[in-house]
Amino acid sequence: MTAMPDPSVEAQQFFAERYGIDSARIASLLSDALAQGGDFAELFFEHRTNGAISLEDQQIKSALRSVEQGVGIRVVKGDSIGYAYTESLDPEAMRLAAATAARIGEGSDLPTAIDTTPVGASESYYGENALLSDEPAAAKVALLERADRAARAFDPSIARVDASIADERKVVLVARSDGQIVGDVQPLMRFNVMALSQRGENRQTARTGGGGRLGVEYFDRVTPEDTAREAARQAILLQDAVDAPAGEVPVVLAAGDSGILLHEAIGHGLEADFNRKGTSNYTDRIGQPVASDLVTVIDDATIEQSRGSINVDDEGNPTKSNTLIEGGILRGYLHDEISARHFGAEPTGSGRRQSFKHPIMPRMTNTLMLPGPSTPDEVIGSVERGIYCVSFSGGQVNISNGDFVFSTTEAYLIEKGQITAPLRTTNLIGNGPEALSRVSMVANDYALSDGRWTCGKEGQSVPVGVGLPTVLVSAMTVGGTQLG
């Protein structure tokens, strides 16, 4: 846990001092939201500052700075939800938004008095808050230029380098009709590099990057040169890549970035809204085996400085580590307030939204498989012929049945227990529950991906983290190679 000013208090002071949104104003808006007889109301105030600079082939291509602000107002009446938002924090605009959301409970016309109690956050999982947004543009450009020089110096075949840096500072305040007021100040940054290697007519590109819930201190851990050299290494590696073997073969998933396969192919099916609707492969299966007994999966929003971490969710609930699968047994789902009420469960701190313009839904934060008893060498050494997957560009999954397709960005052939030739971009085709049941070895080298993933669901994007130890899936379909 990082020692820093209480972000909840900081957020409350920010909205009170800048916009006059104090406890009295909040209580009045909540009363307006419940004026038509709603059971519960919630205000979600947001002020977000974004910045981005990109360098393309040694030229500054863009430099952007934007501010977005507003409030989303939700009213719950039975199983119905009314939602409205306004980009204006003017008192009259907010009152009209509250009245619009209130119409879901129209007909009761019950006056409601709200007693609000601000609360502080007991823990913060972010960095020291030395925000990139506080750095001059010239300092950010210097970081990009360092990456450009390092990638080009790595090998003469590097013909082009693109780099970008993005930062965000989001101040949120959640006020609820049960009296709770809680806020947060959420930093986020990301640094990306693309390198292009050219040998004759053979052109190969690779992209890498990282970031998290921190600021300039990220570069004390991973320098621009580190990121650039990794992108260059991957691009050069693809120059000598060969076709992947086709058909069903053993697949070793490397520690770290391979966790995106776990996130997409399995994690979404464990979000409670899909199970409430009966559209998930895991509906009504709590307490049942859903994976190999080597598999334990958690979703943990409390990992310090990770991209998916948050102090409180967007409903104001404290976040925590949630065990989803334990020893192959399904233990629970990820809940927001609505799904928790439906299942008679406690909220898991998983209610998230892209912004004040969007409704709440259960979402993952940092989704991880815990380490097992084997070593990475033992896992790889057990494979006579298969593939070793290090990183992915993303994929597609059918939530209802778990079928997925993923494309690798770095993968290798395994022959007689040894990693040999690099492979061209390769598609993995499979089924999430089936892949979990085929996990035959799990190593002790768990690693978290370095903060580059964003998850999309029903039109909403949120930052997430993924992690995995080295894992052997005894059989998975390799569905072809895309020539670079």
Describe each region flagged by the PLM.
Residues 1-484:
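N-terminal small-residue-enriched
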